[in-house]
Amino acid sequence: MENNKFNETVEKITRLILTSPQKMIREEDLINLSEDFNFDDIIGNVYLNLKNSGFEFIISKFLDQKYYVLTIEGKDDNITPSQYGTLALIAALAKEIDENMKITDLKEIFSEVWSSDVEFLIQNEYLRELKDLGLIKVTPLGKAVLKNIIEDLQLKNLLDVFKNK
């Protein structure tokens, strides 16, 4: 009986993740959905279900909270190459200056692509505008989109690419 309830909980969480319009979910919410079962056991089984269905489920930290992000292999077709490049540059800048990027500075740096790229990235939750603090941060979804290159993402390397062109 206990095993059936465990499997039902795993199935319920997996279904919720797959059908949710949001591509990310807070760890705290997943813990609450896990009922009285061990969270690590539940999330491990959810991860296997998603992996067996061709998805990836990665962990990212944002504003001192852990998020789980549902992704698939390859690039997101909703994002243009220019938007990918803009997001990569912003992520590299964030890494260099400890993630606190002023909106005013970014508007100046990305003035040519602000309305086409940066606003799209904000509207689609790849970037979050913290208006009260005057900052922009890369969201877990934005980090997930760049997951295959984020470890090597350094501002110096990106600038070298553009310098060599």
Identify the function of each model-found stretch:
Residues F37-V46, E108-N124:
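Short amphipathic alpha-helical interaction segments
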